Amino acid sequence: MSINIRIVTPTGFLWETKAEEILLPSTTAPLIVLPGHINILTGLSPGLLRVKVDSRWKPILISSGAAQILTSDSTNVDVGIMEVEEIKQENFKEAELLLEKANDALNIINPIDIRERIKAGEAKSFAESRVEAFKFLAT
């Protein structure tokens, strides 16, 4: 039995496929989805969404969003995300530089300015996920 996964963004439909397994970057903890999973709605953190298709993992870098898992005759996963980024191996150095800049920005933010601190924290989290995606592809 497989999992039907659909990914959408605010600009429209992005991707649909049948998967063997899915690893979601849930806001509480990484969430592994297998066929027959219980019904659940979860928030997604910026991170690496991994989809196993034909015994190979496909990494997808996402920003925040939500996922709904519904199981009846089959397991269906609908993922709504704000942004998605294609991972290209030649951009690894750029990803490391962006992470360094995000760390620097977080260190110079006024600790009293909560909005700026949250924004800088999200940028750092996304930059860390980008570097993680490149390392994932290298293995």
From Swiss-Prot:
Keywords: ATP synthesis, CF(1), Chloroplast, Hydrogen ion transport, Ion transport, Membrane, Plastid, Thylakoid, Transport. InterPro entries: ATP_synth_F1_dsu/esu, ATP_synth_F1_dsu/esu_N, ATPsynth_dsu/esu_N. It holds the Pfam family ATP-synt_DE_N. It is a peripheral membrane protein. Its main location: plastid. Coiled coil: none annotated. One of its GO terms (cellular component) is chloroplast thylakoid membrane. It comes from the Eukaryota. It is found in: Plastid, Chloroplast thylakoid membrane. F-type ATPases have 2 components, CF(1) - the catalytic core - and CF(0) - the membrane proton channel. CF(1) has five subunits: alpha(3), beta(3), gamma(1), delta(1), epsilon(1). CF(0) has three main subunits: a, b and c. Belongs to the ATPase epsilon chain family. This is ATP synthase epsilon chain, chloroplastic. The lineage of its organism: Eukaryota, Sar, Stramenopiles, Ochrophyta, PX clade. The gene is atpE.
